[in-house]
Amino acid sequence: MSLGGVSEASRATPEIQMIANKVRPQLEAKTNKKYEKFEAVEYKTQVVAGENIFIKMDVGHGCFIHIKVFNGPTGKDNYELHGYQTDKTMDEELTYF
């Protein structure tokens, strides 16, 4: 993957689930919802001045959310929610947003 390019989708790992869990309170505050299910399904990464991680989340009842998480160049696991897209389906591709 080149600098700035988005990787191919990969199956979510326990590390990706941990990252999603860290930004879950930020997402729930922004959407004003509590998600009973919050399971990472797949992800893509993008190397910038740090790293963007795009994660497809299964939030239950056939609903999915795409989240964009940023980790700064310090590499200190300072994850921040930088965007999200609601009303997604399992079949929708994760894309840059």
UniProtKB/Swiss-Prot annotation:
Top-level taxon of origin: Eukaryota
CDD domains, per the entry: CY
Gene3D superfamilies with a match to the protein in the record: 3.10.450.10
Site, as annotated: Reactive site: 4
Keywords, ordered alphabetically: Cytoplasm, Protease inhibitor, Thiol protease inhibitor
Subcellular location: Cytoplasm
GO cellular component term of the entry, any: cytoplasm
Annotated source species: Mus musculus (Mouse)
Motif, Secondary area of contact: chain positions: 46-50
Name of the molecule in the record: Stefin-1
MF-aspect GO terms: cysteine-type endopeptidase inhibitor activity; endopeptidase inhibitor activity
Keyword Cytoplasm in record: yes
InterPro entries on file: Cystatin_dom, Cystatin_sf, Prot_inh_cystat_CS, Prot_inh_stefin
PROSITE patterns for this protein: CYSTATIN
Keyword Ribosomal protein assigned: no
Family listed: Belongs to the cystatin family.
UniProt xrefs under SUPFAM superfamilies: Cystatin/monellin
Cited function: This is an intracellular thiol proteinase inhibitor.
